[in-house]
């Protein structure tokens, strides 16, 4: 009986060491650029999956994190420039792939530039219906 208990304990220890720790979606790097009334946000994101099978769902989740400003390691400052008028994202499945420069996919979350009144531009929070995801 004691031998069975030890075998079960050893098995549990080995199995717990073999399971992958879940990866939480997070920003690996970010860069913002402003010019007049235009604010662009460029981010590199690690997805919370080994592979990204549904780009649309993953992209929408990333944009929602940007809107909610709730990435684990990064907080964006929307108090000075407001919400972005454009977001460019490179998605990676792991930090290892990020270091290698191996993207899973990339996309832009864009709107048309308002040429009639350049002082009033769409942003991702106030005018989400004016934006679309464009895959590169």
Label for each model-derived stretch:
Residues 108-136:
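C-terminal partner/receptor-binding element of secreted or periplasmic proteins
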Residues 14-17:
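C-terminal motif of bacterial Sec signal peptides marking the signal peptidase cleavage site
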Residues 42-106:
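Mature extracytoplasmic domains of secretory-pathway proteins
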Residues 2-9:
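Sec-dependent signal peptide recognition
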Residues 19-21:
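Bacterial signal peptide processing site
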Residues 23-50:
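Extracytoplasmic/periplasm-facing segments of secreted or lipoprotein envelope proteins
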Residues 32-40, 79, 127-136:
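Exposed acidic/polar residues on beta-strands and adjacent loops within beta-sheet cores, strongest
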């Amino acid at each position: 009986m004691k031998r069975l208990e030890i075998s079960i304990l050893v098995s549990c220890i080995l199995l717990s060491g073999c399971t992958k720790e879940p990866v939480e979606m997070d920003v690996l790097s970010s860069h913002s650029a402003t010019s007049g009334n235009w604010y662009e946000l460029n981010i590199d994101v690690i997805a919370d999956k080994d592979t990204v099978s549904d780009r649309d769902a993953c992209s929408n989740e990333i944009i929602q994190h940007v809107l909610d400003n709730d990435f684990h390691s990064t907080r964006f400052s929307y108090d000075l420039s407001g919400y972005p008028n454009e977001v460019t994202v490179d998605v990676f499945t792991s930090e290892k792939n990020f270091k290698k420069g191996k993207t899973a996919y990339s996309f832009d979350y864009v709107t048309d530039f308002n040429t009639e009144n350049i002082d009033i531009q769409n942003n991702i929070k106030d005018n989400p219906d004016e934006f679309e995801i464009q895959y590169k």
